[in-house]
């Protein structure tokens, strides 16, 4: 394992219409970082050209081949200082005349390889072709490096697939504009992707060096100006952010000199608990992730619903069923006192019994599918006139399951879900074999439980199955995930310091309102909340405290608003299902092994065909 090494995230600001000058300036900053001892240096997206051109024709003279003039100049620095550089380049392919938004990796012996951006935003599609490199991983002395570019982070796959392929470290290449809340409705077209890139590390156990621009770019031929967000950051593979630059001040000018963030990456952390969860994936459940369900999906909700969503938290004490019922009922009474509205109320995991400590205790508290827990939840649903979700230990044909139940306002059971990605402590439980989504009068509802949230494939399937709302009873004690480390100043609404990063990520990458209910006491860290589809500039999430019983509610309209930068329909349309196939393959299959073990991104295992 290599020793900790110095890294640099460079907030470099290229100039429009100045390709040669941009190479000189980018090389000067790269030389400075390399001379300071940085072994990995990351520069922003389109770093040699600038970005907001009028059209492809105006952009073309400032594009470069990869490898090309830019990588050749950087290679001299890498050779001189024994370092690696990841840089964003607007690429022209001379063989085809196709143009790509590309990340290039250069090392001590020269050009190593490229990644062509897959997650194209509404500007990218004006002049770039979707990437055709997959998500390659490059083996270096610093670890296995992958590149992710800006809007890619709208999706969970761009980090997950490299992680499954063995990546250790992300070079995140970005030109992310910041939210201008004073613009009102116009701000809703703004995505500010660098604002919350934590999911890329937190879900996959990868280190990351993330670079953005931090200035204003103005195109005098269009009058368009964009303020880039700054907020370069450095992340360890165990999920900690160990370096961070501030968000840009919106009054900065074109002449802002940029900045360099230095820090260290510790390769000893490449082996970590979250990366170990890759061995617990359930590819046999993920088949629909390879389905492209756009532009039309007849399973998707045809209309939106104005509803109230609520998360309930209270002390759930093992062995105190009557007390748990009483504490849950106290919260139900507070909700009954409020004006009635359609909606859904989510209770913590093991709603009435508490979590069993061992198999004997699990067997003792197990119930039938319509046992006491479901009966009490049915009573709550009728009294609240809302859908209700809770969970219990279910006994069925001699097996035990951790089961979530969705109960309708009339008290009938709409559906149930057996936890598919079991917490390691649940040795008594059998795993479920489906990730269902249920049609209801308030839209389509998906269910997850506890450590399911550590697996983006699980919420990914619910998104592909077009869940409008995801309800998650949990018993979270802080052993995984952790607090969301946002970039202050890039959100229209701030986040509570105890916002759980994975719950936020589920909502963001599934584009489904996500309602999580956790217990308090006995090590549980509360923080129940409603996590919104568009937290950057439209809706603030609501999060409960760590210790206190209570409820948190939010009035929402399912499916979001048509003028938002993203919704589930757009998310599904933007997915690269052709590249996502490996998440669905059995890990002992020939196609998976060929993809995992072959350099680059070998898709021949599922694309090769001869008549």
PLM segments and residue spans:
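CN hydrolase (nitrilase-like) catalytic-core segments centered on the catalytic cysteine
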Residues: 66-86, 153-261, 367-389, 454-551
